[in-house]
Amino acid sequence: MDVIRTAIGLMSGTSMDGIDVALIRTDGRGFIERGPFMGVPYDADFRGQLKRALELSRPLTDRSERPAELREIELELTLRHAIAVTAFMERFGLAADAVDVLGFHGQTVLHRPDEGLTIQIGDGGELAKRTAISVVYDMRANDMVHGGQGAPLVPAYHAALAGKFQQAGQAVCFVNIGGISNLTFIGTDGRISAFDSGPGNTLIDQWVEMQTGRTYDPGGEIGGRGKVVASLAERYLQSPFFRGNVRRSLDRGDFAPLQSEEASLEDGARTLAHVAAASIIKSGGFLPETPALYIVCGGGRLNATLMAEFSVMAERLGSRVLTAEEAGFDGDAMEAEAWAYLAVRSLDGLPLTFPGTTGVGAPVTGGVLATP
């Protein structure tokens, strides 16, 4: 009988807005019992430190390199994760010995799949010591060692969640609109395909922050007052990324931000929401079949302008669009839940990535285990 474990997943994504903390009970296979979720936002000063970490990481050629300033940021990130875990457990009445493992993503500061290089800062050993809970971390690297792109990793969890829709004979596509958007397609035959689909919130967030000092477009309100600037949209949508037959994982630096003089605040936000939606549809053209259903998670599902654009485009192809909540899930918690699920799979030596998800030659496990 497969062992059911209690796991907490910790996710700090490319949007760099905070830590998502989620608990599940799972056997790392088909059994999933979803528990509580909590978000812990970063303050502006620490978001600035993470942006500095991106700059410090550019010249690195080894995933273990930590120049002194980057190491300081890594330790601060780890401390904030430890504090988040402690706050989560106090809030929901959990003791350390009630949790079997933490799945710790860390913060991606460099991702160059063509060079076989990915760097996530975050000290798993230090986190295990501070929380008194075993930690699985650095889950992307082994995939890249074996020729994969190192992303996306969440598809294994999406496939486990998709069971009820497959029973209805539907091809389902999960869309995670984070800083970068990615797709997980589960066909009617159960086959999984997954890849990054293009820019998600990153370009919108960068634009709004540059123009207003706010870190995002709340509810898509700013974009909702603008119009699409076709020439700017086409500049993004004509990227070689959308033309090649080989899918690859993306870094937040793969698409250059708009320049301040290129559009009004509202038109820029609307154009970039259109680009985010159209990117999903364009990349969806590489799927084995058109999904009957798109399930949207990640922060982008809260941008009404982006969602309206995407829904119209999908409906033209005969597809239905639901938010994660409309499908019975929690769109805020899903990535953190996935990291908890992957940690349990790692403990059991089960594959985290597959040829259809990262391009790795054969299914491989991953992750490094740190004990208290």
UniProtKB/Swiss-Prot annotation:
Protein name (record): Anhydro-N-acetylmuramic acid kinase
Chain positions recorded as ATP binding sites: 13-20
Summary of the function given for this chain in its UniProt record: Catalyzes the specific phosphorylation of 1,6-anhydro-N-acetylmuramic acid (anhMurNAc) with the simultaneous cleavage of the 1,6-anhydro ring, generating MurNAc-6-P. Is required for the utilization of anhMurNAc either imported from the medium or derived from its own cell wall murein, and thus plays a role in cell wall recycling.
Record GO terms (molecular function): ATP binding; kinase activity; phosphotransferase activity, alcohol group as acceptor
GO BP annotation list: 1,6-anhydro-N-acetyl-beta-muramic acid catabolic process; amino sugar metabolic process; peptidoglycan turnover
Pathway: Amino-sugar metabolism; 1,6-anhydro-N-acetylmuramate degradation; Cell wall biogenesis; peptidoglycan recycling
Homology family: Belongs to the anhydro-N-acetylmuramic acid kinase family.
Gene3D superfamilies: 3.30.420.40
Top enzyme class: transferase
NCBIfam families named in the record: PRK09585.1-5
Keywords: ATP-binding, Carbohydrate metabolism, Kinase, Nucleotide-binding, Transferase
HAMAP family: AnhMurNAc_kinase
Pfam families associated with the record: AnmK
Entry annotated with the keyword ATP-binding: yes
Source organism superkingdom: Bacteria
EC number assigned by the record: 2.7.1.170
Key word ATP-binding present: yes
Residues passing through the membrane, by range: none
Reaction(s) the record says it catalyses: 1,6-anhydro-N-acetyl-beta-muramate + ATP + H2O = N-acetyl-D-muramate 6-phosphate + ADP + H(+)
